[in-house]
């Protein structure tokens, strides 16, 4: 059965399907929208008591519901200076060292950090010998992405690609999954060196958004696009630890890359398959360089 599911993903018109679902999710269809939201809440056992708007009818579209805000204070941010926090609600897929430019995906599968970053060689070089973490956001999860530490945006790259599902089953069977799917790469400068936040698209992910540029995808194409940003002066974009940096309209995955020696140890309990909660301790940082 697993082989059938994977084979279907290769055959499906994934981009067309994702655009269609995106249009439906953006539609403001009144009672139909509310009915779809109620079904989704029941199907995935979503705890709406955490949402700023807990009533399904409060959302004009399914996208509004899916990118719902949480109640203030429901995810307290660990403000300890030497603590990096979880950027999302989800589950750790994999984490560990970047070895010779290779990142572990699943048993028998690795992929290139250079390819992940859109073949930006200078960016990849900055993370040689560093660490990575991959976090999967399930449909039930809160889908806003926050900063794990304070950082100033220096570069953003849009990389076109496939739209395979990014669930654990697909990660085990599709080689180079996260480096072949459509993605947005944001590079931040921090006290602990560069930080890459890679927002990976997936089947029926209607779009990826950032707080500084709005919707990045769609539209899609064959071309890699890069934007560079000033890191000093009035136009610099600096986000504090815990600030929102982006969101997925329907679920996906975040891959983080850290500079060599930025991380001392991952926090207690942070390991493959561990549940993550935005704002809780993710890693212990070394002293700034």
Curated annotation (Swiss-Prot):
GO cellular component terms attached to this protein's record: plasma membrane
Keyword terms, alphabetized: Cell membrane, Decarboxylase, Lipid biosynthesis, Lipid metabolism, Lyase, Membrane, Phospholipid biosynthesis, Phospholipid metabolism, Pyruvate, Zymogen
Required co-factors: pyruvate
Site (Cleavage (non-hydrolytic)): 251-252
Annotated positions of the Pyruvic acid (Ser) modification: 252
UniProt PTM: Is synthesized initially as an inactive proenzyme. Formation of the active enzyme involves a self-maturation process in which the active site pyruvoyl group is generated from an internal serine residue via an autocatalytic post-translational modification. Two non-identical subunits are generated from the proenzyme in this reaction, and the pyruvate is formed at the N-terminus of the alpha chain, which is derived from the carboxyl end of the proenzyme.
InterPro entries documented for this protein: PS_Dcarbxylase, PSD-B, PSD_type1_pro
Functional pathway: Phospholipid metabolism; phosphatidylethanolamine biosynthesis; phosphatidylethanolamine from CDP-diacylglycerol: step 2/2
EC number: 4.1.1.65
Function according to Swiss-Prot or TrEMBL: Catalyzes the formation of phosphatidylethanolamine (PtdEtn) from phosphatidylserine (PtdSer).
Assembly and interaction partners: Heterodimer of a large membrane-associated beta subunit and a small pyruvoyl-containing alpha subunit.
Family membership: Belongs to the phosphatidylserine decarboxylase family. PSD-B subfamily. Prokaryotic type I sub-subfamily.
Protein name, as recorded: Phosphatidylserine decarboxylase proenzyme
Organism of derivation: Shewanella sp. (strain W3-18-1)
Annotated gene: psd
């Amino acid at each position: 059965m697993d082989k059938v599911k994977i084979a279907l993903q290769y055959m499906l018109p994934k981009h067309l399907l994702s655009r269609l679902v995106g249009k439906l999710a953006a539609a403001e269809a009144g009672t139909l929208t509310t009915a779809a939201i109620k079904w989704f809440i029941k199907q995935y056992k979503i705890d709406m008591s955490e949402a700023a708007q807990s009533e399904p009818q409060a959302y004009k579209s399914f996208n509004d519901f899916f990118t719902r805000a949480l109640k203030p204070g429901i995810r307290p941010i660990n403000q300890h200076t030497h603590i990096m926090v979880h950027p999302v609600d989800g589950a750790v897929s994999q984490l560990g060292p970047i070895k010779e430019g290779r990142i572990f995906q699943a048993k028998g599968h690795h992929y290139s950090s250079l390819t992940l970053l859109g073949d930006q060689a200078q960016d990849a070089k900055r993370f040689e010998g560093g660490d990575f973490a991959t976090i999967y956001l399930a449909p039930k999860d809160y889908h806003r992405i926050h900063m794990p530490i304070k950082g100033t945006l220096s570069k953003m790259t849009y990389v076109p690609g496939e739209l395979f599902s990014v669930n654990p089953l697909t990660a085990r069977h599709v080689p180079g999954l996260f480096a072949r799917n459509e993605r947005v790469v944001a590079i931040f400068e921090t006290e602990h060196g560069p930080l890459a936040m890679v927002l990976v698209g997936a089947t029926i992910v209607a779009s990826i958004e950032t707080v500084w540029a709005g919707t990045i995808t769609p539209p899609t194409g064959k071309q890699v696009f890069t934007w560079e940003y000033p890191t000093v002066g009035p136009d610099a974009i600096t986000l504090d630890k815990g600030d929102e940096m982006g969101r997925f309209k329907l679920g996906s995955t975040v891959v983080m890359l850290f500079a060599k020696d930025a991380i001392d140890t991952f926090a207690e309990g942070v390991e493959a398959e561990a549940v993550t909660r935005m704002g809780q301790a993710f890693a212990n940082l070394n002293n700034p360089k």
